């Protein structure tokens, strides 16, 4: 193609456009028909160049609307929303759930740095606001005991150290959110001879009153601080207060029911009365031999806090939940659910009853309050005692059944008339 000026190119394209507008014969004059013939003669070369430059297929291929919008095939959507996959996902084997949870839990977590309380106290002492003379007895933070039932006094763990002249006692204010340590002055130190070996020290008697007086006068507090019993770390034992309260309640209950005073020796054993500290136990049977204790812990810790979980022997596991509701949810979730291809048979031990895997309806019956069962326990234990059972009066039975007394029955005989 020879070099053409811009004017000639515009002129040629204009004549080609005029020829396209007047395609129909018989319309227009001689010029239009001559223009058509002239354009038809020169048409093949132009159409070739037009197809090379402006091919409609190339434009459609480059700017396809489906490619821009990212439209997916309908079959892929159907596969994603298929109900069969949803059903399979809900009833999947528990082993698949464990494996997926392990893959998610492989992200490394930064270990928490647990600082010792003694280091914190030493940092406080080094600050300029602290006292110049370091105190001899140090106080650790008050422990949060989760396994006690409303103990009136809270235990504080204080290690005691020997001192030739005396010892310094720190008072812990448990009523404030942040524990403040108050040191008494050296003039008011209580001199107690302490041997070089550590010993148990209990603040009782006049020492308690003296300590409350010192705390109210020196620390100028509106209310006397509760003094706690100071024991050694290794010698700490849980209080036995709740069991005694429970036995007292049972004795009073049995006396009101029987109207007879019974010695506490004849009470039924306290084993069926389950305290909330014991937790709710659930046994899992029909397990695959390759199921380990870690699998049991990982499987049931999702439902709630576990008190303990162990594998009794291959095929049988025992799980104890802290809360009763968590045990019920775990029973509903995992009962008759497959683990490694075998359905788990869960037995729930609640309030002395055992709900097996074939009796899920007993969950509703066992949700009744346990106070009724506690009141029924002495009633069951009374016939087993040495007292003979009370004699039943037949008149009372007749009154209850027929709403009439025995005397009326004897005085008024029944007449029968028989017709033959």
Curated annotation (Swiss-Prot):
What keywords sit in the KW lines? Answer: Acetylation, Cytoplasm, Isopeptide bond, Methylation, mRNA transport, Nucleus, Phosphoprotein, RNA-binding, Translation regulation, Transport, Ubl conjugation
Show the stretches that span the lipid bilayer: none
Q: Which GO terms describe its molecular function?
A: protein-containing complex binding; RNA binding
Give the sites modified to Omega-N-methylarginine: 33
Q: Does the keyword Phosphoprotein apply?
A: yes
Q: Where is the composition biased (Basic and acidic residues)?
A: 370-379
One Pfam family named in its UniProt record: RRM_1
Q: Could you state one GO biological process linked to this protein?
A: positive regulation of translation
Residues in cross-link Glycyl lysine isopeptide (Lys-Gly) (interchain with G-Cter in SUMO2): 200, 223, 248, 372, 417
Tell me where in this chain the RRM domain is found: 280-351
Q: Where is this region: Disordered?
A: 256-277, 369-394
What does the record give as the function of this protein? Is involved in regulation of translation. Is preferentially associated with CBC-bound spliced mRNA-protein complexes during the pioneer round of mRNA translation. Contributes to enhanced translational efficiency of spliced over nonspliced mRNAs. Recruits activated ribosomal protein S6 kinase beta-1 I/RPS6KB1 to newly synthesized mRNA. Involved in nuclear mRNA export; probably mediated by association with the TREX complex.
- Recorded protein name is Polymerase delta-interacting protein 3
Q: What gene name is given for the protein in this entry?
A: Poldip3
């Amino acid at each position: 193609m020879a070099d053409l000026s811009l004017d000639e190119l515009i002129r040629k394209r204009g004549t080609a456009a005029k020829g396209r507008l007047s395609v129909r014969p018989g319309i227009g004059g001689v010029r239009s028909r001559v223009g058509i013939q002239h354009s038809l003669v020169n048409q093949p070369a132009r159409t070739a160049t037009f197809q090379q430059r402006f091919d409609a297929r190339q434009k459609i291929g480059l700017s396809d609307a489906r490619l821009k919008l990212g439209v997916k095939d309908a079959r892929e959507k159907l596969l994603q929303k298929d109900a069969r996959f949803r059903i399979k996902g809900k009833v999947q084997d528990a082993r698949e759930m464990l494996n997926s949870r392990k893959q998610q839990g492989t992200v490394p977590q930064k270990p928490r740095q647990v600082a010792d309380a003694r280091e914190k106290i030493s940092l406080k002492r080094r600050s300029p606001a602290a006292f110049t003379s370091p105190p001899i007895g140090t106080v650790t933070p008050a422990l949060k005991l989760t396994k006690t039932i409303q103990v009136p006094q809270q235990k504080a763990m204080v290690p005691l150290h020997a001192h030739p002249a005396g010892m310094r006692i720190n008072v812990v204010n448990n009523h404030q959110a942040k524990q403040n340590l108050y040191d008494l002055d050296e003039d008011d130190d209580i001199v107690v001879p302490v041997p070089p070996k550590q010993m148990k020290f209990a603040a009782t008697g006049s020492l308690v009153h003296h300590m409350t007086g010192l705390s109210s006068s020196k620390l100028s507090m509106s209310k006397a601080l509760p003094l706690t019993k100071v024991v050694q770390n290794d010698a700490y034992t849980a209080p036995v207060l709740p069991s005694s309260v429970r036995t007292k309640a049972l004795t009073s209950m049995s006396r009101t029911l029987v109207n007879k005073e019974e010695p506490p020796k004849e009470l039924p054993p306290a084993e069926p009365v389950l305290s909330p500290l014991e937790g709710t136990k659930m046994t899992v049977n029909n397990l695959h031999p390759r199921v380990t204790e870690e699998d049991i812990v990982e499987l049931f810790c999702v439902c709630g806090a576990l008190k303990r979980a162990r594998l009794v022997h291959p095929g049988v596991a025992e799980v104890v939940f802290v809360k009763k509701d968590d045990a019920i949810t775990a029973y509903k979730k995992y009962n008759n659910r497959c683990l490694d291809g075998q359905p788990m048979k869960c037995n729930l031990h609640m309030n002395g009853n055992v709900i097996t895997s074939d009796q899920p309806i007993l969950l509703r019956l066992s949700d009744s309050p346990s106070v009724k069962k506690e009141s029924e326990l002495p009633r069951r234990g009374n016939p087993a005692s040495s007292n003979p059972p009370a004699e039943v009066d037949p008149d009372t039975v007749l009154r209850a059944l027929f709403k009439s007394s025995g005397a009326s029955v004897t005085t008024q005989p029944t007449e029968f008339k028989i017709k033959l």
